[in-house]
Amino acid sequence: MPFKNSFNLKYITARGRWYDYSWKGDTKKSGGLATNIGIHFFDMLLWIFGNVKENNVTYRDDKTISGFLKLEKANVNWFLSCDYDKLPQSIKDKNQRAYRIMTLDNQEIDFSDGFTDLHTISYQEILKGNGFSIDETIPSIALVHEITNKNI
């Protein structure tokens, strides 16, 4: 059996009360947390570690969702939340509202900073014709759809 990487994703980006009343807080309009804050990570994971072999959702409420994926080249534990109460106290103490950690084979990567202009740059590239094709995006969209609608 080939070696499988161990990958963990913990992504918490606290949202204010507005979130509950906006289209982003409505799963029917936004696709839910897996789509809203997770799509880019699931896309990256599939690109790096291959196709989904197993998909388990272990927890879901209005502000948090978590699960486990078996991909061709990695076992992935993931946790997504927009709940301020889920932030580590050390992050709250610094008056920060985001905690983004990836761990690959016990090596931790903190990417809590650096997201400021990411969407703007992405949209600019799309307008230049440098977007992705439907065929390239289908696996990620199918995965987040399954995650959002999977029975626990």
What are these regions (language model features)?
Residues D62-D117:
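C-terminal substrate-binding/catalytic lobe of Rossmann-fold NAD(P)-dependent oxidoreductases
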Residues L118-Q124:
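Conserved C-terminal active-site "lid" loop/helix of NAD(P)H-dependent oxidoreductases
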Residues M1-K53:
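Predominantly a Rossmann-like dinucleotide-binding segment in NAD(P)-dependent oxidoreductases
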Residues Q124-I152:
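C-terminal helix-rich "cap/oligomerization" subdomain common to oxidoreductases
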Residues T35, I39, T116, G131:
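Electropositive phosphate-/nucleotide-binding environments in soluble metabolic enzymes
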Residues F41-F42, H119, V144:
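A general structural signal for well-ordered alpha-helical segments in protein cores
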Residues W47-N55, L80-K86:
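Short Pro/Gly-enriched beta-strand edge/turn motifs at strand-loop
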